[in-house]
């Protein structure tokens, strides 16, 4: 899939398939024909080791992405072999901290691809709780950057929309009543999704036990390997913003709710907020997570 050198463009076009190097070289030629400066940004993939700072070697290079210069002061990056990518939405394995743009007239330069693009999931849930413990409502979500790429990939690998909805229901432990998406097939950085759902919670005597975070951000710890190699490296920068509005059933009151929390790492790179409020029969949860 990933390569540094290309076959003949005629051969690639005839076969209709090729490595990312094959397709990226064709893209560079097309952009230059259109008058848009474009150059290879060569690198060592993240899973193949870091390029040595003191003695960088061509033997350590194993692939490249396309650096596009739409203006004199702007660079954007694209790997044209990715079906669900976009400008500055690269496979995480290519988001290296050290790549070399190969440009003429002494304009070559070192660049970091670690923080290119914006990756954001913004979701709003409006739902009501019945006396039987059934939460019924809608979830509106905007997926941006890597989140949009992942959603498109999930849809593409499903057999059809029914299978996609079935997997969503299984993952979130809900019944999907309606599913609507916009922008899934567009070359754009975001996808909009609307889900109408039902979710059953536990009812015991006169109590209903509801997790106000109806759709979990993380369902299990990512740090469960028996061995861990340092340093720990996250795939990309990340932002999640969730707002949940729940209406409690008539005749019920909130007996107990989670405490507000604000957690932050010592270097400020990771921040999580959990703020829950109540006004009459309305419970509102605002959850945010940021990884820089």
Question: How would you name each of these model-derived features?
Answer:
Residues 1-292:
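A sensor for short, sequence-defined functional sites
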